[in-house]
């Protein structure tokens, strides 16, 4: 059988692409080296932030607004356990923070619902938070967080119900191109398609070694917290910048545990074996202490944590492009630790590519050629 589309990597973007392409009527094969959702990539750990007024640059705002529409649609398939939780997101940092300036600019340009608070206003609304006098907060009331593993599980199930073929626990070892399309090699044999999408995450260079992607080991952890920090108490998800420039992110507490991670830093790695489990690097359990001590002093000890990986591009912007000389193969990579919120729209973009549809978005800033 020759498929319309083969998807290599069915984590966040791949799961979405499989669903949207199958829903569009294409004959699709989803593949993954493991059984998604799984612990080997960048989507585990239950939750991911979604922010609309984007501190990483306003070029992302049209994408994230479409992503939100698609997340809302997907959430309707899980109304008892919603995939998107509109908790709001408070962005904290010094008044002269470049990241917060970008958030404010994005909000102004796209007329987003963002409220600016000074230090006293932040602490009056959320007494659990402590910030210096020179800090401000930009509160995105319509943002929140996503259930990442539940989202992937839902997409995969919906795609399967729609007739999508799925080949999991079976790594793709090679990709070949010829006049008839794309062939992938696996332990289960060879499969052919008219087009392919490569969204293999951290280890995309195993298949496409020419891509400028650097895997980085990252950790996040859950700390002891009480009901004051919960969604029920209107405690928001958050990003926070310390005076030294370190960037943190976190979520409202659930089951007396608050999840937090440090966005910058981490350990550069070159193989999956180097992504050692949480606590095998001495700093893992204490990485969030500077933020917790200064901003959330009521949070208790570290309960447990997990390691994941970022697939970093040189400028930490996404890479979305077709292979040079092979315009029937699209790759989506270099998501650099801020990609999950876009998984829905990136999957839709991939499905449009498979249907020969022109994208509704300007993807020029994400082309591979910017590094050449």
From Swiss-Prot:
Documented EC number(s): 1.5.3.-
Gene3D superfamilies, A to Z: D-Amino Acid Oxidase, subunit A, domain 2, FAD/NAD(P)-binding domain
Cofactor(s) the protein requires to work: FAD
Manner of cofactor binding, per the entry note: Binds 1 FAD per subunit.
Positions of modified residues (S-8alpha-FAD cysteine): 308
Molecular functions per Gene Ontology: flavin adenine dinucleotide binding; N-methyl-L-amino-acid oxidase activity; sarcosine oxidase activity
Family annotation (Pfam families): DAO (PF01266)
NCBIfam families: PRK11259.1 (NF008425)
Quaternary structure and partners: Monomer.
Protein name per Swiss-Prot or TrEMBL: N-methyl-L-tryptophan oxidase
Encoding gene, per UniProt annotation: solA
């Amino acid at each position: 059988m020759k498929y319309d589309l083969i998807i290599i990597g069915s984590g966040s973007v791949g799961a979405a692409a499989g669903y949207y392409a199958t829903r569009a009527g294409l004959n699709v094969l989803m593949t993954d080296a493991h059984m998604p959702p799984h612990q080997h990539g960048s989507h585990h750990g239950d939750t991911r932030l979604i922010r609309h007024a984007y501190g990483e640059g306003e070029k992302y705002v049209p994408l994230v607004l479409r992503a939100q529409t698609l997340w809302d649609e997907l959430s309707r398939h899980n109304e008892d356990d919603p995939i998107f939780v509109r908790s709001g997101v408070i962005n904290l940092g010094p008044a002269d923070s470049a990241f917060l300036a970008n958030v404010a600019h994005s909000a102004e340009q796209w007329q987003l619902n963002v409220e600016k608070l000074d230090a006293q206003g932040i602490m009056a609304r959320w007494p659990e938070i402590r910030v210096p006098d020179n800090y401000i907060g930009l509160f995105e009331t319509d943002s929140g967080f996503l259930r990442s593993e539940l989202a992937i599980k839902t997409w995969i199930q919906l795609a399967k119900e729609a007739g999508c073929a799925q080949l999991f626990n079976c790594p793709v070892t090679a990709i070949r191109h010829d006049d008839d399309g794309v062939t992938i090699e696996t332990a289960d044999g060879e499969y052919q398609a008219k087009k392919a999408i490569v969204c293999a995450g951290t280890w995309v260079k195993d298949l496409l070694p020419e891509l400028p992607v650097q895997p980085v080991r990252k950790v996040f952890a859950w700390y002891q917290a009480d009901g004051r920090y919960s969604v029920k108490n209107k405690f928001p998800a958050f990003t926070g910048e310390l005076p030294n420039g370190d960037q943190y992110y976190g979520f409202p507490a659930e089951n007396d545990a608050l999840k937090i991670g440090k966005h910058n830093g981490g350990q550069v790695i070159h193989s999956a074996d180097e992504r050692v489990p949480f606590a095998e690097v001495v700093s893992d359990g204490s990485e969030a202490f500077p933020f917790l001590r200064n901003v959330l002093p009521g949070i208790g000890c570290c309960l447990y944590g997990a390691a994941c990986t970022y697939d970093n591009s040189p400028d930490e912007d996404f890479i979305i492009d077709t292979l040079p000389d092979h315009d029937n193969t699209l790759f989506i990579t270099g998501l650099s630790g801020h990609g999950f919120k876009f998984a829905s729209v990136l999957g839709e973009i991939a499905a449009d590519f498979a249907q020969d549809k022109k994208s509704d978005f300007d993807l020029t800033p994400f082309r591979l050629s910017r590094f050449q």
